[in-house]
Design a protein with these regions (language model features):
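Gly/Ala-rich beta-loop-alpha elbow adjacent to hydrolase catalytic centers
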Residues: 100-104, 108
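Acidic catalytic loop of the alpha/beta-hydrolase fold
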Residues: 222-226
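Conserved alpha/beta-hydrolase catalytic His-Asp/Glu region
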Residues: 133-135, 152-208
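Catalytic histidine-centered segment of alpha/beta-hydrolase-like enzymes
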Residues: 249-262
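Short beta-strand/loop motif that positions the catalytic acidic residue
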Residues: 211, 217-219
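Conserved HGGG/HGGXW glycine-rich cap/lid loop of the alpha/beta-hydrolase fold
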Residues: 14-69
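Active-site loop/oxyanion-hole signature of alpha/beta-hydrolase fold enzymes
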Residues: 58-99
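Flexible "cap/lid" loop of the alpha/beta hydrolase fold
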Residues: 113, 121-150
Length: 294
């Protein structure tokens, strides 16, 4: 299962590394939107769950992963810009579905509010419109550690909060990845978090009101940072919304254990292809480094 790799020029401003997993029998294409500080590697398990039922597209933000060597990093990217990048990729790959994880939900909501004509359904996982007390504490500590380039504390912060239910192997991957990021990546994350802490989260609900396709909101039962209960606020704004809670799992859903992997896959595929019976897929734990998402 080798992807077709390309670095795409987006509007002459950004170059974006992409991986396209083409499945000959697949009728639909899904693009995956990762979270902050994450790379394409963070979706290794998700790709295995969706391929070959779908063609699968992964990409790295211009400041991250294998995109960053192709860009100058002269200015911070806003969520609006990330949303526009996603719209360009949806058009380029003719994607009918979008699946986001964690902070990737912000750019996805921005993109979907533009009502891209090709997109039929979307899944937004581990995201909520609420900054509750645990999330605020996490973000406030994060912006402090990032601002001081305290790599050790940033790495441990993730594993002791949103990543606390991950297997120890993935925690080691997370720590290694986060503590070795480039300075401009820390700057980008500091910019994002500062904006979240000082802005009106109602902007996500306003974007949600413009969405005219079915959206599944997927959250973990044990995730106290983007809780299933908080995510249900989207139901008052997305006209065609549904909700699924993955039992006995936290923020990282399918990465955390076999049952979470199975249940996440069944929820996603059951939503995207409700007429098909979901086949169970064996869980693969250690395939690639799994980057984390703020």
């Amino acid at each position: 299962m080798r992807p077709e790799i390309a670095v795409l020029d987006i509007q002459g401003q950004y170059r974006v590394y992409t991986e396209f997993y083409r499945a000959d029998a697949a009728a639909k294409t899904i693009i995956l939107v990762n979270g902050s500080m994450a790379t394409t590697a963070s979706f290794a398990q998700t790709v295995k769950s969706l391929y070959p039922q779908f063609n699968v597209v992964l990409y790295d933000q211009p400041y991250a992963g294998r995109s960053k060597i192709h860009n100058r990093h002269e200015q911070m990217l806003t969520k609006e810009v990330e949303g526009q990048l996603l719209l360009e990729l949806i058009d380029h790959f003719a994607a009918e579905h979008v699946l986001s994880f964690s902070w990737g939900g912000a750019a996805t909501l921005v993109a979907l509010a533009h009502r891209p004509r090709r997109v039929e359904k979307a899944v937004i996982s581990s995201f909520s419109p609420v900054i509750n007390a645990p999330m605020r504490d996490y973000l406030e500590r994060g912006v402090d550690y990032l601002g001081n380039l305290d790599r050790d504390r940033v790495g441990h912060l993730v594993n002791s909060t949103i990543g606390k239910h991950l297997p120890s192997l993935f925690k080691r991957f997370n720590y290694k990845h986060v503590s070795s990021l480039a300075e401009h990546e820390y700057g980008q994350m500091h910019f994002h978090i500062s904006h979240v802490l000082n802005s009106d989260r109602l902007c996500y609900l306003k974007a949600a009101k413009q969405i005219d396709i079915p959206v599944l909101f997927l959250n973990g039962e044990w995730d106290e940072y983007t809780s299933a209960q908080d995510a249900k606020l989207f139901g008052q704004h997305v006209a065609n919304s549904s909700f699924s809670t993955i039992q006995a799992t936290g923020h990282f859903l399918d990465m955390e254990h076999k049952a979470a992997c199975r249940d996440s896959r069944e929820a996603v595929v059951g939503f995207l292809k409700p007429q098909r019976q979901v086949n169970r897929l064996r869980y693969h734990q250690g395939q690639a480094q799994h980057a984390f998402a703020i």
